[in-house]
Amino acid sequence: MTTESGSDSESKPDQEAEPQEAAGAQGRAGAPVPEPPKEEQQQALEQFAAAAAHSTPVRREVTDKEQEFAARAAKQLEYQQLEDDKLSQKSSSSKLSRSPLKIVKKPKSMQCKVILLDGSEYTCDVEKRSRGQVLFDKVCEHLNLLEKDYFGLTYRDAENQKNWLDPAKEIKKQVRSGAWHFSFNVKFYPPDPAQLSEDITRYYLCLQLRDDIVSGRLPCSFVTLALLGSYTVQSELGDYDPDECGSDYISEFRFAPNHTKELEDKVIELHKSHRGMTPAEAEMHFLENAKKLSMYGVDLHHAKDSEGVEIMLGVCASGLLIYRDRLRINRFAWPKVLKISYKRNNFYIKIRPGEFEQFESTIGFKLPNHRAAKRLWKVCVEHHTFFRLLLPEAPPKKFLTLGSKFRYSGRTQAQTRRASALIDRPAPYFERSSSKRYTMSRSLDGEVGTGQYATTKGISQTNLITTVTPEKKAEEERDEEEDKRRKGEEVTPISAIRHEGKSPGLGTDSCPLSPPSTHCAPTSPTELRRRCKENDCKLPGYEPSRAEHLPGEPALDSDGPGRPYLGDQDVAFSYRQQTGKGTTLFSFSLQLPESFPSLLDDDGYLSFPNLSETNLLPQSLQHYLPIRSPSLVPCFLFIFFFLLSASFSVPYALTLSFPLALCLCYLEPKAASLSASLDNDPSDSSEEETDSERTDTAADGETTATESDQEEDAELKAQELEKTQDDLMKHQTNISELKRTFLETSTDTAVTNEWEKRLSTSPVRLAARQEDAPMIEPLVPEETKQSSGEKLMDGSEIFSLLESARKPTEFIGGVTSTSQSWVQKMETKTESSGIETEPTVHHLPLSTEKVVQETVLVEERRVVHASGDASYSAGDSGDAAAQPAFTGIKGKEGSALTEGAKEEGGEEVAKAVLEQEETAAASRERQEEQSAAIHISETLEQKPHFESSTVKTETISFGSVSPGGVKLEISTKEVPVVHTETKTITYESSQVDPGTDLEPGVLMSAQTITSETTSTTTTTHITKTVKGGISETRIEKRIVITGDADIDHDQALAQAIKEAKEQHPDMSVTKVVVHKETEITPEDGED
C-alpha cells in the first residue's frame, strides 16, 4: 500500500524505499503519524554510505523496530484511504477527482436583509433553496431569543402587500421577485404578557407595541399615551435625574402619531413618579396597560360587507372582529365560528347556531382580490390554531383533497408555554436601544396626525400586518423614485405595429414596445424576462405609427422596435413585415413575459387567470362578451374535452367550445338572478345578509350587534324596489322568449296549459308587491322564510274596525318576437262574449309564421285593515277588474303594445310591468268597454266578502306579413281559463307606539321553529330585542292550511288566536294577516 512519486525513488532499493515513501505518503495524506527517531535515521544513513562504497551492494539488515514502523505506516495509510472513500460520497472535491468531466454546481446563496424591531438591520446569507425556518432561526439566534413562536418574518409581494413568511416552504417560492428583504415582527400577541418567561421576549413585544402606537394601528387616549410613554422613558433612560435631564431630554422619543408638547409635559410628570423602577418592571407595567386596549393584537384587513359598505376585518387571539368607521360593530369568538373558507375574492364565516337558533348561518365578505382573501384565511387559520388548539393540525396527506392543504406548522401557545417553563438558562444580558427611530415627526403612513384620534387614515392606508420604520419608508420612496427615473430614461418613443392582411384581431390592444436593438445576438428566455421587466409599463392608448426596420435586420430579432409587450402576465404576438432586396418576409414571434401566470396557487390547486387582464380582445368586444367571468376558462376546458371525447376532432372541438363557453358564462348571472327573483320575495333580498346581524354573546359577557336592515331609509327601499322591478321585467321578457320557443316545439295542449299555469304564478305575486304594505304572500308548504321587511305594530285590541280597500293590479304581458321587441301597431276587435278575439296584424318583423301563446294576467287584491273604530266601512264597489284584451293606441308609428293598470289613490300599481304614459286612459277605456263582461259588486254586512285575484290565460295565434304583403287574420276559438281566487285580510290593533321604529333595539336572539303535518304547516319566528334596558319578545306565526275540502278560515283564525293567547297569556296579539287562495275550475269561471 505504498505510493511512489518522483523518479528518484525508482533508483533506490526496495528495502530503503518502503519506509521513506510510506512516511512521505503519510505526510501528504495528513495522517498524524510520529516521525522515526533521529538515531534510527542516522544509523540508516551510515549504513547507506557504507554500502555505496563497495562495488557490490550489500543487503541492509532490517531491525524489528523498522518493520513495526513500516507496518504501522501501512495501516495508517489504509485507514486514511478508507476515510477518503467515505468522504467522497459527500465531498464535491472527491466527486471532481472521481469524475473530472462532471461539473458540480455550488449551492447558490442569497443575501437576506432583515429589519429588526429596534430599526437596525441584520444581514445574513442563506441558500437559495432554504426554507423559511432556516432564516427565522438565524434571526432568533442573532437576537438571542428562545420564545420565538410569537414572532415571524414578513415580506412584500409584487402588489406591495405584506405577507407572513411560511417557515415550512422554500423562500424562493414565496419571494418570487425582488431582493430578499424581510421584517421581524410579532405575529401572535400574547393575551397575558406576564406569562412570558424571559425579559428579552417582553422587550421585543414592547418594541412592537410602540411601533403600533406610533403608526396608528393601536389607537390610545391621551392619558394612556402619556402613561405608556412614561414607562418607555423609564425603561430606556432609567430614573429621572434633574441634574442630567434637561427640559428636552425626551425630545428624541416618539410617543404618538400626533406628538405634542402637552404630551411631552405629561410624560415627564409621570416619569418622575417611576423612581426606582427597573427596566423590566417598567416594561411589564407597559404591557399590562397595553393589553387592555381594544385594538391590542388585532390584524386588520380591508373588506366589504354584502351591501358593499367598507369595513375592516380584524383577527386576534379571541376571534374575528368587524369594524366600521373605527367602531367595532360585531365580534365572532373562535368557539362561535364553525368554519372559515374563501372562494375567489369572497371570505365566508359559518357561525355555529346559538341557543335559540336551529341552523347555522354563513356570513360572506368581499375582499379586494383572491390573494387578499387567501391571506386573510391563512391568518385566521394560524391564529385559531395557535391560540385555541393544544397541538397543530397536521396537513392532509391524501393525494386529492378538497380545499387547501395549508396548516399552521409551528408550535401552539400551549406548547410554547410548556417549552418556556423548561428554560433554565440565566437571564440573557441585552442592551435596550434608545428610541431614536421615532425622531421623524410624521406617522408611518406619510401624513402628519391632525387630532388625538386621527388614526383612521393611517389604519386604512398602511399595511396592517407589520411595522414600517420611517427610515425604511424613506428608503423605499428613494428606490421608487430611482425606478421611475430609470424607466423614464429607458422608454423610447412608441411605434406601433402595422397590421395588414387577415389579422384584424391583432394590434387592437395597447402595448408599449421595447427599445430598438442594433445587434442580432441570440437572446435567452432569461434575457427576455429581464428586458420585459425593464419595460414593464402600460399605455392607455395605442398610437398608430409605422415601424421601420433596417434592411439587414434579421427576421427573428427578439428585441426589435416592433416588439410589443403587454405586461407580466400577457403573451404578445408580433406581426411584422420586412422588405429587403425585393422579398417580403412575414414572421410571427412569441415574446415570453417575465413570469407566466401559474395555473396552480401556492397550495397546489388550480386557479384560473382572469382573461380580461390579458387584453387579447378590444375594449368594445370585451364590453359585450363575458370575458371577465371567472368561469370562462373552466367552462371552455370542460366543453372542449367533452366534444373532443365525443367527436375525436380537435378543430371541431375548438370551433364549438369557445362560443358555447361564452354563452354559458353570459347566461350564468342571469340564471342565478332569475332563480333568486322567482324563488325569493323582493323584500327578502337582504335575508342572507341579515345573518350577520345575529348577536354574538361571548364568554366575557360582552355583547355587540349590527344595525338592522329594517332601520334603512325609505328612499333606499324605494330605490332597491325599483331596481328589483326592473330586473323582474327583464326576467319576464326572458320567460316570454322561453315560452315562445317551448310552444313552437310542443303540440300537446295539456302540457301547454300546465306550462302556462306554472308561468302564471310568480310574475303576478312579484308584480303586485309594489307598495310597502304589511301583507304576507300566499305560502306553499315549502316556503317558510320570514320576510325581513315587515313591521310589527304594538297594541292590544283586535277586530275593532274592518276597513275594506281594493288594490287591483293588472298584468298584461306583451307579445314578443325573436329579437325580444314588442309587436308594433296592432288593432283588436273584442266581441261581447269575450271568447272570440280577432286581431289584425299590420306589421311584424318576422318573415315566417309564428304561433305565440301569451299569458294575460289580471290580479285583483283586496286588503282589509282593522283599526280602532267600531264601525264597518263598505268597500269601494265602483272599481271592477277588467277583462284582458289588446288595446290599440292611436299615435305615432312604432308605439309598443301597451298594458293597462288602474290608478287608485295616486299610486301607479303597474310600474313593475311596463311604464306607459297612457296606462290610466287605456285602463278606463277597457273598463268601460267590458263592464258587461265582468261586473263585481259587493256589500259588506257582518263580515267582508271578497272577489280577488283572477288569472286568465288566452291562446292567441296570429301570423306575420307574408313577403307579398298579404295580411293574415287568424282567430282563436279555444280559451283555456285558469281562475285563482286570493283573499287577504289584515287585522291591526289601534294602539301604535309612535316611537317603535325610531329607537333601534339590540337584537338578542332569533329563533325559527317549523312543524309540518299533512295539511297544516306552522312557522314560528321568535325575536328578542333589548330597547332602553327593557327586554321585548315578539312571536310571529305563519299557518299554511292546504286541503281539497273547504276550510272555514274564520274558525281557523279564531282557533289560531285562541291558541296563541293560551300559549302566551302574558303577551298581546298586535297583528293578524289572513291570505286565502283557492283555485276553481274553468267551468265555474265561465259561469
Curated annotation (Swiss-Prot):
Expressed at high levels in brain, with lower levels in kidney, intestine, and testis. Detected in lung. Residues 514-860 are annotated as: Spectrin--actin-binding. Residues 459-469, 516-526, 947-960 have a biased composition (Polar residues). Residues 110-391 form the FERM domain. The modification N-acetylmethionine is found at residue 1. The modification Phosphoserine is found at residues 88, 420, 443, 460, 708, 960, 962. Residues 394-513 are annotated as: Hydrophilic. Residues 20-32, 698-707 have a biased composition (Low complexity). The modification Phosphothreonine is found at residues 469, 492, 706, 1081. InterPro entries: Band4.1-L3_FERM_F1, Band_4.1_C, Band_41_domain, Ez/rad/moesin-like, FA, FERM/acyl-CoA-bd_prot_sf, FERM_2, FERM_central. Residues 1-43, 459-529, 541-563, 675-715, 937-965 are annotated as: Disordered. SUPFAM superfamilies: PH domain-like (SSF50729), Second domain of FERM (SSF47031), Ubiquitin-like (SSF54236). One of its GO terms (cellular component) is cytosol. Residues 681-691 have a biased composition (Acidic residues). One of its GO terms (biological process) is protein localization to paranode region of axon. The modification N-acetylthreonine is found at residue 2. Keywords: Acetylation, Actin-binding, Apoptosis, Cell junction, Cell membrane, Cytoplasm, Cytoskeleton, Membrane, Phosphoprotein, Tumor suppressor. Tumor suppressor that inhibits cell proliferation and promotes apoptosis. Modulates the activity of protein arginine N-methyltransferases, including PRMT3 and PRMT5. Interacts (via FERM domain) with CADM1. Interacts (via FERM domain) with PRMT3; the interaction is direct and inhibits the protein-arginine N-methyltransferase activity of PRMT3. Interacts with PRMT5. Interacts with PRMT6. This is Band 4.1-like protein 3.
